[in-house]
Structure formats: C-alpha cells, structure tokens
C-alpha cells in the first residue's frame, strides 16, 4: 500500500520495465541477470522483445513483481548503469 498520498504506485505490484539497448546476442541475458539479482520470482519467459526497424536496437519489456519503491529504484539504477543499456523506461 502507498505510504504517502503523493505516491502513484501501490506496492507490492507488478511493474513493466522497458529496457532498450544495442542489438546483441547477450543483451537479453544481461537484463535477465540484473533483474534476477533483485527479484527472486522473475519469469524471463514472459519478456516481450522487439527489434528496431533498422535492426540496431532491441527493446525488452519485463513485467517485474516488486515489493517496494526502493527495490524498483535499485533495478532501474543497475539496468541504467550497464554500458549496453541505452534507456530504461
């Protein structure tokens, strides 16, 4: 439940995270590894993958069950900090 009236998200919840990076064979494995460090029950089989029209980038949409805002923030920080990641939305 949201502790603060200004919070827009109530935890725990499923939260979609979109990660965009340069197309490579290992990018999805990198994203899965990072998320697994924070979420025990992450189901990588449900990731939605979409390549860009020119084939240069790939986006992964991961529906992640998070318990707290802090947990979600740590996932974003780690994904954003990886050199192969371009954007995390």
Residue positions per predicted region:
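Long, contiguous binding/interaction regions
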Residues: 1-59, 65-89
């Amino acid at each position: 439940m949201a502790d603060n009236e200004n919070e827009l998200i109530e935890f725990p919840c499923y939260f979609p995270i979109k990660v965009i990076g340069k197309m490579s064979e290992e990018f999805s494995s990198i994203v899965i590894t990072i998320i697994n460090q924070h979420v025990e029950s992450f189901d990588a089989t449900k990731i939605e993958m979409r390549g860009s029209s020119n084939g240069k980038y790939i986006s992964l949409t991961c529906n992640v069950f998070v318990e707290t805002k802090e947990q979600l923030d740590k996932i974003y920080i780690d994904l954003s900090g990886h050199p192969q990641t371009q954007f995390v939305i």
